[in-house]
Swiss-Prot record:
The keyword S-adenosyl-L-methionine does not apply. Residues 306-316 have a biased composition (Pro residues). One of its GO terms (cellular component) is plasma membrane. It comes from Mycobacterium tuberculosis (strain CDC 1551 / Oshkosh). SUPFAM superfamilies: PE/PPE dimer-like. Residues 303-322 are annotated as: Disordered. It is a multi-pass membrane protein. The gene is PPE1. The chain crosses the membrane at residues 3-23, 88-108, 112-132, 216-236, 245-265, 276-296, 323-343, 419-439. This is Uncharacterized PPE family protein PPE1. It is found in: Cell membrane. Keywords: Cell membrane, Membrane, Transmembrane, Transmembrane helix.
Amino acid sequence: MAIPPEVHSGLLSAGCGPGSLLVAAQQWQELSDQYALACAELGQLLGEVQASSWQGTAATQYVAAHGPYLAWLEQTAINSAVTAAQHVAAAAAYCSALAAMPTPAELAANHAIHGVLIATNFFGINTVPIALNEADYVRMWLQAADTMAAYQAVADAATVAVPSTQPAPPIRAPGGDAADTRLDVLSSIGQLIRDILDFIANPYKYFLEFFEQFGFSPAVTVVLALVALQLYDFLWYPYYASYGLLLLPFFTPTLSALTALSALIHLLNLPPAGLLPIAAALGPGDQWGANLAVAVTPATAAVPGGSPPTSNPAPAAPSSNSVGSASAAPGISYAVPGLAPPGVSSGPKAGTKSPDTAADTLATAGAARPGLARAHRRKRSESGVGIRGYRDEFLDATATVDAATDVPAPANAAGSQGAGTLGFAGTAPTTSGAAAGMVQLSSHSTSTTVPLLPTTWTTDAEQ
């Protein structure tokens, strides 16, 4: 009613007309005739099967198998005829509406007359003609609205009355529906399992598709999907915990095997058994005895002929104020186990007139404890050994001799050959060492061989 008559008249006049509806109705009618003919032929064939030699159980099953298809042909023929009739009804309604609808020409003439009357309305002489013309336009307005309403009602009824055509049923033996039902159930279960697995793999996609069905905006849909995903994670995690408790007994043997493997690895990292009693016998306070347990310095033999022998230099250990430190860096082990290194003054020094005597060297090499060294020195003083024209110094393991500050420390260069990797499995680091070995010094009376002391041994003054 609110739409002007020009709109309704223009839509009906500009349409394709009833020709397409009538052609479609004719096609549906021909299709109905074909279905009816096929139904009649199949019914005749089934009757001949039952009346001829095809009798018994096979003929009965044959007729029963074609029964659903025969019924479908008959029903489809009826539906096609009804559809054709509805097309004809819609075409008739269109023709009736087009005939009852004011034409665009009539509406245009009414507007033209109204314009002329308004233009020539001097002193109100055209008041009555203008009112009559407007009343005629109102009539056409109401007529167009009623015509379009009636046409819409008939068209909607015809559309609703058109039956839907079902697909043709398969021709199968009686009882095949039950097997198909079981297959459908199995297929439905498999599809359900696949949907569940897909949902677990990507729940966000399913939440997004679910909220998109409600017509929300993309932003609102994304927010709702994220909220649903958080709730899903919060509710699903307890199931993960329960599954972990159920599967824990199956993982216990694996954890036990890993624990035993770690214990075996720890045993492989232990030092050799032969070095443990040595370290225990030496005690925690014996630094040089501990060095024996870590590294063994190979002995060198003196080269005959009076020339200084060549030996592989050992790395020099850094000085340490704590003698009993168990973490001392690798150094040169002393020749006698259990004996601390002698003082700096016991070796050959630059600026002295003569070296120490061979007796001093032998006394130093044979001393096993500081008490024996002091007893030996006391015995020498009591025996009245004459003092020569140069100073004698006696080797003492616990001697406290002040080193001369003006005498520089001997500068010994490292050899070209190292001592190799020290310690078990090469665990002890190697550093550059000073020269070490035995030297032979000549004097006016004797020629003695004395050991060279490492430059890393500190004096009491430095300590």
